[in-house]
Amino acid sequence: MQVLHVCSEMFPLLKTGGLADVIGALPAAQIADGVDVRVLLPGFPDIRRGIPDAHVVSRRDTFAGKISLLFGHYNGVGIYLIDAPHLYERPGSPYHDTNLYAYTDNVLRFALLGWVGCEMACGLDPFWRPDVVHAHDWHAGLAPAYLAARGRPAKSVFTVHNLAYQGMFYAKHMDDIELPWSFFNMHGLEFNGQLSFLKAGLYYADHITAVSPTYAREITEPQFAYGMEGLLRQRHLEGRLSGILNGVDEKIWNPESDLLLASRYTRDTLEEKAENKRQLQIAMGLKVNDKVPLFAVVSRLTNQKGLDLVLEALPGLLEQGGQLALLGAGDPVLQEGFLAAAAEHPGQVGVQIGYHEAFSHRIMGGADVILVPSRFEPCGLTQLYGLKYGTLPLVRRTGGLADTVSDSSLENLADGIASGFVFEDSNAWSLLRAIRRAFVLWSRPSLWRFVQRQAMAMDFSWQVAAKSYRELYYRLK
């Protein structure tokens, strides 16, 4: 079984979001599971620099100009790169310029990605041809459409990491991307009079996956589907929509071997976690105190992530004696709100605006509770890292959060399945009730330690996801 992942980024070569983490870990797990997997990426500068052994496999003159297909390796995974400097050789973000305006030729830049994915199934590399083309998010959404136009030389899977990003372009660009105009209709890639790369993937793929079982159900409902609910409901009824939970890359996120921590630990040596908390309190300007629970946020500061709820609930958290450490950036209003809270409550609230991968490890290793109060969350990785590190997740019941965290209710404690704190409604009062439950559990240290050990024993490794994808590929075959 030969599988080609088609995507726009890959950790640690290039990362703007969770998609990169998935592509950075899943292919290696699949190779270990016996699947011959390779990855196709645009030749963005950071990616090119990370694969110095890449050599030319093929050259083509395409609708987007002359390109070369390169092949190399990264961490044991075969990587194809689309070498097209006129499209990809740009500083900064792969998607927009320094003024945050989307590149005007994105339609060509990412149509080409899908086209090359299809051409791989047609023999672009004469020595390797995929049985399955696995496209990820809107950037690769045209790959299943090109495969359909070419008579489906390979099966296709389209994974939705976040349905909110749709890749919408003017209809006139159908003339530029070498797809038949017959594809531009409601039973195709047309959406609200425009060309939708996301809908192309959803409509033409042989199978759609979402990054958690709950998110796969949610996106058949209007409040989560951004207008795609009719198509997704149909795919669900046809048995062509399923949810496969993302995993944790245990080579990177593992408190037993994490060199970014002041003190490494396991579920049997949790007392070693205390030194990480002390170091984090010092680094964030918090009062050093191991008797109070330290809550943390590592997130983009947006309303989608529920950070406005955290700001609203913060006085209640502080009144109960808790501390907050926040690492993130985003909405200027939220940034100012948290900075003001830090100024008003020195020693109790610490804020770092920005994102630093290394410091996020220190927060995960040192905090007691990680807050993930998202309004929607396709899968979420932060809560998985929290579980792995014995930093109990406090989450809203949505998407992958609902699939991975069990509330520390009396029933769940008795059944030995409690792993964090879960609230239902997207409001500050509901969040505060969950925070109150965290304080109650904190007041019983032996029970807190029991839940930590339960959380750390859970298996969210990529090996589990790799097995599920392998079973899906063979069903399609």
From Swiss-Prot:
GO molecular function, one term: alpha-1,4-glucan glucosyltransferase (ADP-glucose donor) activity
Protein name: Glycogen synthase
Regions annotated as coiled coil: none
Catalytic activity from the UniProt record: [(1->4)-alpha-D-glucosyl](n) + ADP-alpha-D-glucose = [(1->4)-alpha-D-glucosyl](n+1) + ADP + H(+)
UniProt pathway annotation: Glycan biosynthesis; glycogen biosynthesis
Family designation: Belongs to the glycosyltransferase 1 family. Bacterial/plant glycogen synthase subfamily.
Presence of keyword Transferase: yes
Key words, A-Z: Glycogen biosynthesis, Glycosyltransferase, Transferase
Species: Salmonella typhimurium (strain LT2 / SGSC1412 / ATCC 700720)
EC number(s) from the headed UniProt entry: 2.4.1.21
Organism ancestry: Bacteria, Pseudomonadati, Pseudomonadota, Gammaproteobacteria, Enterobacterales
Function per UniProt: Synthesizes alpha-1,4-glucan chains using ADP-glucose.
InterPro entries given in the database record: Glyco_trans_1 (IPR001296), GS/SS (IPR011835), Starch_synth_cat_dom (IPR013534)
Any one of the GO BP annotations: glycogen biosynthetic process
UniProt keyword annotation of Glycosyltransferase present: yes
Transmembrane segments: none
Residues that coordinate or bind ADP-alpha-D-glucose: 15
Cellular component aspect of the GO annotation: cytosol
Enzyme class: transferase
